[in-house]
Amino acid sequence: MKNYKWQEWDINHFKTLYPQLQADTTKELIHNRMGRLYWVWKDDALYVQRFARENGPYQGRNLKWLRKCLPNARTIVDVGMNVANNTMEYATWAETVHGFEPTPSTFALAEANVELNQHVELKGRYYNSQKVMSEHDPDHADGWYKFPDKTFASLTMSADVHLHNVGLGDVAGSFQMEDHPNNVGHNCILTEERKQKTKYEVYDVTVNTLDSYNFENVDAIKVDCEGYEYPILKGALQTIQRCRPVVQLEIVEAQCKKFGYTPQDMFDLFHKQVGNYVTTDFQGNDIGTDWQRIKGVMDRFFVPKEIYQKIPKDNSKVRHPGMERPQINEEIFEELFE
């Protein structure tokens, strides 16, 4: 694929580069206000709500805190990559990024998204919120991470990116997952009980342990796997002990319950088993060693003390345009997984 300069940005042309996806009526190519491009499922409205139009990167507040923790990240591992939305942003500042996604159809979109965005230069803003339409203004500086001098960090994907079409867990093997056609972010490995109840299509996936890859210089691990976070951590324990990365986990209590553990088990892994970690929210606040619900916050960051102590503290709540999100009622959210 040729490299496209910012003057050549044309979403209609980019669609033609992937004729199979373009012909698939269940897929569409969308973009956010910074020009980042995503092949997604057309019937999954959450993708447009989270990724497109006036939005910056999904969960930009988490990205900003992770980059603040690790301004010179060497290797970042993205577990539960989905369509590579986070993988692509990690690639703007890390040296190496590994993305893991077990669902074949999702993995295919992630591959296309990484390939396309690696070849497209971005400059300015690509969406006019006042006109509610796509419009490129190359002179309107934009991005999701600001340096102290108020300039935006580059959106160029400069990292060496490796994508893996497998799942991760505490043991290697073949597992079954269920496919949520209108919300693929909820695809998950099935417990024995769930296998008897699921109404969704079931498919087999290969699962390895993260430790089996023997990755070096792992500075960050992000895990968002619909309740399977703790088994993944257990299969990554040697890597965590050896590399002492910042670990970002999505934690929903009801999802943990499905797999027979509690959020506190993950807190104890870092604070009692590994040791010398600080648990924070996306603003860097130390939230202690015990699990507690925080309204509107689903991710927790486990940060090595030697890293946390060096981070300049700034608890500003100012957000860039498009990053505002309605507060999530986590109790209602969790009821969906009972």
What is each stretch, according to the model?
Residues 1-158, 195-200, 215, 278-338:
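S-adenosyl-L-methionine
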Residues 54-75, 144-147, 176, 190-243, ...:
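Short internal loop-to-helix segment that lines adenine-nucleotide cofactor pockets
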Residues 90, 236-244, 270-273:
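Short, conserved loop/helix-junction motifs that constitute active-site signature segments
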Residues 167-170, 209:
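Conserved acidic residues
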Residues 173-182:
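Polar, low-complexity loop segments and adjacent catalytic/binding residues used for recognizing
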Residues 244-251:
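Conserved beta-strand signature within the Rossmann-like core of class I S-adenosyl-L-methionine
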Residues 263-276:
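Conserved Class I S-adenosyl-L-methionine
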